[in-house]
Amino acid sequence: TALLTIAVMTSCGSSKPVTQTVQQPAVQQDVEINVPCSGPEFQTNKEYFRASSMGLSTDMSIAKKKAMTEARAEIATAINAKVKSVTDSYVSSYQQGENDESKSRYQSLTRTVVEQELSGTRVICEKTMKTPDGKYKVYVSLELAGEEIMNAMANRIKNDDKLRIDFEYEKFKKVFEEEMSKN
């Protein structure tokens, strides 16, 4: 009898349309990610060459070395590009009888200066994190004063017999500062 009563109760009701509320999936929002040692204060400006990088490894010292190496490589690339622009402008504007040999000598000198000056980079930010899987992430930001590069180049030029003949420090400095302002 219990079965019969349930059957009668369920079949005698009025037929109402069943309305289901289907939940819409929540709209995914963009999530801002704050990367350590990054942002405007860590970018190259008219006074400093700057670069930021991250190294990842199961060994903290290797993670740091990776980050430092990559940041130094970025600074070297930026310096080489900037100094090439400076020397091209300087040679074509101020050197008498511009020639490829002068440009080649300036570029060779630049490579030497950059290699030596990179040891003078300064760490302006360093953050170490440990990931859930036990790896280390090291974020670094390095800087090197543009004036240090300019002075090192000027000293090298003054010591080069061929380049020294036509070299005018104040004009070179002016071109260098103009190029640094173009960031």
Label each region the model flagged.
Residues 1-15:
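Sec-dependent bacterial lipoprotein signal peptides
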Residues 12-183:
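Domain-level marker for long, solvent-exposed, non-transmembrane regions
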